[in-house]
Structure formats: C-alpha cells, structure tokens
C-alpha cells in the first residue's frame, strides 16, 4: 500500500483499503455454529468511520445490516456501569482470559467468576446484573432503546431469526450459565438471563450505525453529533482500556500489536474500534480467523492505523 500523504483524506484511505482487499474477499471461515450466521456470504465487506468532528466516511457494504453479536457486550457493559457502578467488578473481572471466548475450563478453576465482561460467561453475568428489577422483555427493550440513543437511529432492531437460532443451538452458553448458577454466581433464572443475552447479541446494525453508536467512546463519553452525555470521561477511558486488553478474546494481544486501537469483535464478522479523540470505526467482513475475529476486518483496521497513525501507542 502506498505511503500516506500529509492531511490525506480518510475517504481516499478507506477506498484504497477496500481496493487492496477486494481480491481477498471471501477469505476466512464464516461462523457456522449459529445456523443463521452460516448463511451469510463471506464476500461482504463494509467499513465506516465517524470522526469526532462529525464527518462520516463509508465504503463497500457499509449500509448493509449484519449481526453485531459480541460487539453488543460493549453496550450492555456501559448500561451495567450506569446502573451498578464499580460494584460490577465484584462479579466479573477485568483481566484478559487467554482462552477461547466460550471456554468453561477457566470458569471452573476460578470459582465461576468470569475473567472479563467480553467473554461469553462475563457477558452472561452482565446480562444477569442488569436484569434486576426487569422482566427479560423489558430489559431487551431497554437495550434496544439505549443502542438507538447512542447511534441516534430509531431503525436499529433485533434480528429475531438470529435470536431464535442462537436459542436453539447455544448449548455451550447454556452450559456456562448453568455452571455459574451452580457456583451461586447468577441471581436470576438461567432461561431469563440467556433470553436477554441471546437477544442483545442478535442486534442487527450497519457499519455506519455501529460507528455512530461507538462515537461516545472516542469523544470522552459524550456523542459530539448529538450532545448526548453517555458516561464520564474516566469511564469512557476505562471501557476503552478493557476493549484494548480483552476485546478480541484470546487474540486481543495480537490485535493490540497489529492495530493498536481499543476494539470489540463479534463472530458475525464485525469489529467496532475506537481512535480516542479522533474517530469511531466499524468494519464488517464475515470470514473469521482462528481466534473468531474478522480476518479482513482486522487487516483493514491494521491498514487504517498504519495510514493514519491512530494507534494509541504512537504513529
């Protein structure tokens, strides 16, 4: 890829990235353990950038909705921190797991307390925490409204076919929830907690919507497009820190090394990344690498960081 020019236009950069990756579209393996996701064409690719100054840049399939899956865990964590504050860390840790996102081994070794809120067990525990005082249906509605508020877009919905598909085949997540319940780590019935979890993972968003929803994390906790204050500057910084260290499962270290941005991936092929003080980025390419993260999405973000100098570790 050619060297960046001073003040190079972001649209030109992502156009170049898309052009360079086009011959590789379809690489990676689509998640096949969720039947609805297995049907997605691996050749899709979309990318959107929303800057803190309000500029929006798009390329490829940036306006095509996809299942955000584990990216939704950033939003439920934000809700949990708003409801329970720092007390949530008594129930879930803040350390990278070094294990697969759906591993049960570490959970047993550590008494049913999940390592962090971004692995499946941790996100299930977060769903349990924010379920307090709600029925599952009420909480699912609150999560959807919150994400719409973040993105300033009322068109964001849950893909109920994906939710049903996950509910019917999510045996490992059912096992994780029951395992935590056996340790006294869940406060609500397993089926209620998983109902919330499966539905928030089934949120369908475009790259443009997702980049807008994550913009508060790039701008010190306030969405500069809407003026909505979401979290404090300190809390935004801490959520970004967790995304950097834990946002890509057992591939988090590799992503930090190659990209150097806080980010959260999902097995639907999406990644939401944050360049603090500069922009929020969303990329989607369904083919996954061995860690369960988007293969070309990760590469696109690596290229973007190299061209812009946006890595938090320096240009």
Curated annotation (Swiss-Prot):
List UniProt keywords, sorted A-Z. Answer: Hydrolase
* Quaternary structure (record): Homotetramer.
Annotated EC: 3.5.1.2
- GO terms for biological process? glutamate biosynthetic process; glutamine catabolic process
Gene3D superfamilies assigned = DD-peptidase/beta-lactamase superfamily (3.40.710.10)
Q: Where does substrate bind?
A: 70, 120, 166, 173, 197, 249, 267
Under PANTHER family, the record lists: GLUTAMINASE
Molecular function GO terms recorded: glutaminase activity
Q: What class of enzyme is it?
A: hydrolase
Q: Which domain of life is it from?
A: Bacteria
Similarity section: Belongs to the glutaminase family.
Q: What is this protein called?
A: Glutaminase
Pfam families (alphabetical): Glutaminase
Q: Which InterPro entries match?
A: Beta-lactam/transpept-like, Glutaminase
Species source reads Rhizobium meliloti (strain 1021) (Ensifer meliloti)
Reactions catalysed: L-glutamine + H2O = L-glutamate + NH4(+)
């Amino acid at each position: 890829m050619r060297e960046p020019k001073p003040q190079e236009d972001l649209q030109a950069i992502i156009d170049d990235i898309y052009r360079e990756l086009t011959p590789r579209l379809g690489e990676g393996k689509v998640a096949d353990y969720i039947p609805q996701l297995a049907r997605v064409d691996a050749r899709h690719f979309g990318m959107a950038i929303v800057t803190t100054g309000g500029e929006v840049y798009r390329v490829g399939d940036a306006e095509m909705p996809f299942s955000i899956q584990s990216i939704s865990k950033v939003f439920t964590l934000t809700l949990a921190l708003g409801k329970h504050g720092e007390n949530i860390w008594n129930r879930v840790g803040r350390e990278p797991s070094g294990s697969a996102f759906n591993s049960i081994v570490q959970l047993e070794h550590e008494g049913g307390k999940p390592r962090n809120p971004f692995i499946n067990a941790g996100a299930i525990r977060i769903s349990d925490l924010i379920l307090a005082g709600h029925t599952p249906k009420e909480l699912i509605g609150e999560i959807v409204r919150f994400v719409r508020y973040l993105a300033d877009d009322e068109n964001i919905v849950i893909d109920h076919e994906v939710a049903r598909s996950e509910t019917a085949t999510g045996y490992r997540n059912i096992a994780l929830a029951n395992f935590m319940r056996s340790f006294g780590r869940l406060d609500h019935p397993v089926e209620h907690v998983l109902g919330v979890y499966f539905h928030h993972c089934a949120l369908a968003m475009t790259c443009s919507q997702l980049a807008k929803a994550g913009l508060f994390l790039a701008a010190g906790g306030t969405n500069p497009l809407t003026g909505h204050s979401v979290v404090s500057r300190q809390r935004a910084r801490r959520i970004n820190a967790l995304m950097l260290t834990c946002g890509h499962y057992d591939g988090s270290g590799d992503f930090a090394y190659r990209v150097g941005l806080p980010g959260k991936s999902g097995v639907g092929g999406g990644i939401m990344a944050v360049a603090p003080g500069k922009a929020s980025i969303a990329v989607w390419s369904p083919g996954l690498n061995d860690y369960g993260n988007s293969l070309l999405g990760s590469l696109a973000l690596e290229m973007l960081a190299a061209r812009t100098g946006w890595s938090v570790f320096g240009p």
